[in-house]
Amino acid sequence: MRFLQFVAMVLTGLALVPFGAHLFALPNKIHLSESDYLIAQNIYRGWALLGIVLIGAALANFALTILVRGQRVPFVFNLVSLLCLLATLAIFFAFTFPANQATNNWTEMPANWQQLRWQWEISHATNAVIIFVAFCSLTVSLLLTQE
């Protein structure tokens, strides 16, 4: 179980990194002009692969939740972590992914680009907060788990 706890912690922590970067960049990006925003968005080329980390974190947290189901408090905290990770996936596919599709991954700027920018930025910021809660909840679960 210790190895799985380690994997869950590492993957959940790594999943927080890109969303945290988006959260902290938001104040600097939200008011950029169309051309400057398009340039800034090019920074994220290839970041889609980081979705693998998020899915891995969710799977590791799922397995860990099953393993600690006999320990009420660690189970609840681990379940919260798992549900938070699943919520980030739901938010991504409900808000971020459609904005990426509408802008061809920010290589084209449609007429409603400002609304799409807001949708994209806020969905990432929201996910940063949710993954932080997942990370904290997982940490509490790990601290309270009996071997």
Label every model-predicted segment.
Residues 106-136:
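Alpha-helical transmembrane segments of multi-pass integral membrane proteins
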Residues 27, 41-65, 85-93, 122, ...:
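Core segments of alpha-helical transmembrane spans in multipass integral membrane proteins
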Residues 66-70, 140-146:
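Structural signal for the C-terminal ends of transmembrane alpha-helices
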